[in-house]
């Protein structure tokens, strides 16, 4: 039904006071609306909440994007496939929650199991969840995974 496929999204731009920034904020909002449309997300959204995905979409097909995809994401996906594990799900939960305890609870696993899996992720990718720059790298990996899964 065509009626069910309609997306109605509105984006709220961050506040600004300089008139010359209208174009910048308009373009940012349009990019976020395009992203929401591709994700089939309706409603009123703040542009700032979607900027990381919007920014990453502009980096698609760059050497940096492909490097993260091949050195982290592809390796973890291959490991999960080969051993029927859930390292990517665990990583996503750990990055999303406020604490490892909350992430373990969300995954219905013991905290030591979560720590073991984070160690396994480090072994496979050479990225340490407990090091800020590596954690950022791992977050980009999860964002790329979602973009690839959603075919954005």
Outline where the language-model segments fall.
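Cytosolic nucleotide-utilizing catalytic cores of signal-transduction proteins
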Residues: 1-152
């Amino acid at each position: 039904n065509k009626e069910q496929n309609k997306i109605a999204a509105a984006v709220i731009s961050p506040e600004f006071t300089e008139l010359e920034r209208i174009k910048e904020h308009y373009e940012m909002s349009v990019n976020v609306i395009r992203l929401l449309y591709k994700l089939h997300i309706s409603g009123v959204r703040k542009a700032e909440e979607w900027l990381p995905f919007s920014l990453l979409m502009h980096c698609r097909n760059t050497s940096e994007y492909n490097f993260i995809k091949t050195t982290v994401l592809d390796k973890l996906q291959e490991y999960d496939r080969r051993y029927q594990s859930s390292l990517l799900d665990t990583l996503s939960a750990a990055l999303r929650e406020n604490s490892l305890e909350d992430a373990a609870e969300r995954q219905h696993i013991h905290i030591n199991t979560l720590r073991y899996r984070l160690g396994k992720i480090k072994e496979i990718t050479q990225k340490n969840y407990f090091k800020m720059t590596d954690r950022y790298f791992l977050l980009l990996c999860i964002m790329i995974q979602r973009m690839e899964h959603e075919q954005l």
